[in-house]
Amino acid sequence: MMITLILFTTGIVMTTLVIPQNKLWANAISQSALLSLSSPLLIFSNHWSAPWHNLSNILASDSISAPLIALSCWLAPISLIASNNTISKQSELNQRTFIIIVIFIAGALIITFSALELLLFYVAFETTLIPTLILITRWGAQMERFQAGLYFMFYTLFGSLPLLISLIAIYISSSSLSIPNVELIWTPSETMETLNIWWALSIIAFLIKMPIYGFHLWLPKAHVEAPVAGSMILAAILLKLGGYGLIRLINLFATISLNSLSLALITFCSWGALVTSIICVRQTDLKALIAYSSVGHMSIVAAAIFSSTNWGTNGALILMIAYGLVSSDLFSLANTVYERSGTRTLAITRGLKTILPLSTLWWLVMSAANLGLPPSPNLIGEILILSSLIAWSIWLFPIIGLATIFGAIYSLMIFQLSQQGTPTNNINNISLSFSREHLLATLHTLPLILIIINPISALITWLK
């Protein structure tokens, strides 16, 4: 199945190179839509009683990777639809390049999430860097995009070398880089101090990619300067690479007692979630606010993964998928406001409910999902995460509780500041909503509804 998806993305790239200009976008969107519709077969065909499915020497899926692969494929046509309005006005070469980059990122993500070999995982993990950098620096709106690209590249490369050194050390110690083999046969003989340093070096790249608070400086810049497709892919999928990598490495290091490091990491991540929630309350830029909320959510996800509990890991996976869809739609909605008003400042983009009443409904739904109101999947993930963290240490309750309260405040603030009040003069004469924009919101909401109906599709049922 993974080979089919990878060949499918290759076919879309080849078709994009040769198809006539007048059929370019229709072809790319329709083919990527077929890709997204075929990807859920991974979830429904997965044997939930077994760790791995569709096993080959280098590619396989399990209940951790299958939902993330489906999410990657699902977001490919959505990001193309969101960008069609602006990119289609550019030159033919720019349009073809943009489509190829988006599909290439989707293919790299499929390989990353389905890689059985740690070295292949590392190569595919780093392959997403250059296309994303091109999206930010080439199609960003302002000159600050070059600084944002520099931050993104520097932070990502900074964490890559320690991860590569760690993988080489794992190969020397276990004589294998196959994930199932390493999980079964690896019994490191190093001292606890050495293993703690080893573990810390291994996770730096993933903490930067998520990112958690303290490693997050590149993310708000990248989100603010990236085009809408870049922001959607970055928020929905690329940040989840960090969480996925942490889950895989936690399983590899499962035979080692890492309680001393877990205490520091969980405390730091929980505190980071609280700090970023407070930062969100003080934001005036709409995209920066959504970007900082991503940092807060991913800090909570990291804390849950470090708890090494079944509830924590399941909650982390559900929240990664659900918040990936919610944040992607929030960036899409923010882009519709920016296209009409030319600004992202919340003090200016107010009173939209009188001009775009149907869009106000989508803002309300996504703001409610962002703060975790029932019956959204975000609530399920947050309950599992909070339960696992409080069971791990009752002293985390005040920190997590305050982070949740501030999360509710800024989620409601997003809706109130953008929709309530009297419209300013510069947005009184804006155009009404397009069917394309409502289609985007519907395509983001539909998977959330499916997860509500069948939450088992996002659970790791074989974890012990």
Swiss-Prot record:
InterPro entries: NADH4_N (IPR000260), NADH_Q_OxRdtase_chainM/4 (IPR010227), NADH_UbQ_OxRdtase (IPR003918), ND/Mrp_TM (IPR001750). Pfam families: Oxidored_q5_N (PF01059), Proton_antipo_M (PF00361). It catalyses: a ubiquinone + NADH + 5 H(+)(in) = a ubiquinol + NAD(+) + 4 H(+)(out). It is found in: Mitochondrion membrane. One of its GO terms (biological process) is ATP synthesis coupled electron transport. Its EC number is 7.1.1.2. Keywords: Electron transport, Membrane, Mitochondrion, NAD, Respiratory chain, Translocase, Transmembrane, Transmembrane helix, Transport, Ubiquinone. GO terms for cellular component: mitochondrial membrane. The chain crosses the membrane at residues 1-21, 63-83, 98-118, 119-139, 152-172, 197-217, 227-247, 261-281, 288-308, 314-334, 355-375, 389-409, 443-463. It is an enzyme of class 7 (translocase). PANTHER family: NADH-UBIQUINONE OXIDOREDUCTASE CHAIN 4. This is NADH-ubiquinone oxidoreductase chain 4.
